[in-house]
């Protein structure tokens, strides 16, 4: 008889068209990936980057989805995956001397964060 492993529930939240470049957002996401929800919130609160505000908003939304839709406990949640893809670029022009114009690219990105409950250890695993 084969037993199937318990299916892992995952909650996902997306933040689309967030102002800021994807590379700067990825720099923050790389540091919180794999951490617990509480640890990630503390880290995001004290990081000196502008992209932490929209990331915190998406993280709180993912946890709210897990709590409301799947009935998971927020204290056991871990960030299973977090990624940022580049979005559309808004092009603006800056007037310069002698009738020239320099282009300015205002980057946007799409942030996605998924959370799942951390695996709990049974008594047999703890004793070994």
UniProtKB/Swiss-Prot annotation:
Keywords: Ribonucleoprotein, Ribosomal protein, RNA-binding, rRNA-binding
Record SUPFAM superfamilies: Ribosomal protein L22
InterPro entries: Ribosomal_uL22 (IPR001063), Ribosomal_uL22_bac/chlpt-type (IPR005727), Ribosomal_uL22_bac/org-type (IPR047867), Ribosomal_uL22_CS (IPR018260), Ribosomal_uL22_sf (IPR036394)
Pfam families: Ribosomal_L22
GO cellular component assignments: cytosolic large ribosomal subunit
Keyword Ribonucleoprotein appears in the UniProt entry: yes
Gene3D superfamilies reported for this sequence: Ribosomal protein L22/L17 (3.90.470.10)
GO BP annotations listed: translation
Origin: domain of life: Bacteria
Subunit structure: Part of the 50S ribosomal subunit.
Stated family: Belongs to the universal ribosomal protein uL22 family.
UniProt xrefs under HAMAP family: Ribosomal_uL22_B
Official protein name in the record: Large ribosomal subunit protein uL22
Species of origin: Prochlorococcus marinus (strain MIT 9301)
Lineage: Bacteria, Bacillati, Cyanobacteriota, Cyanophyceae, Synechococcales
Gene symbol of the encoding locus: rplV
């Amino acid at each position: 008889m084969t037993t199937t492993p318990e299916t892992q529930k995952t909650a996902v939240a997306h933040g689309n068209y967030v102002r800021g470049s994807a590379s700067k957002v990825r720099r923050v996401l790389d540091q919180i990936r794999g951490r617990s929800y509480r640890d990630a919130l503390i880290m995001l609160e004290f990081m000196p980057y502008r992209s932490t505000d929209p990331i915190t908003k998406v993280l709180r939304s993912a946890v709210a989805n897990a709590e409301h839709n799947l009935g998971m406990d927020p204290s056991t949640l871990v960030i299973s995956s977090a990624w940022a893809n580049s979005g559309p670029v808004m092009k603006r022009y800056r007037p310069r001397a002698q009738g020239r114009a320099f282009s300015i690219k205002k980057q946007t990105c799409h942030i996605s964060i998924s959370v799942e409950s951390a695996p709990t250890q049974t008594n047999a695993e703890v004793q070994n």
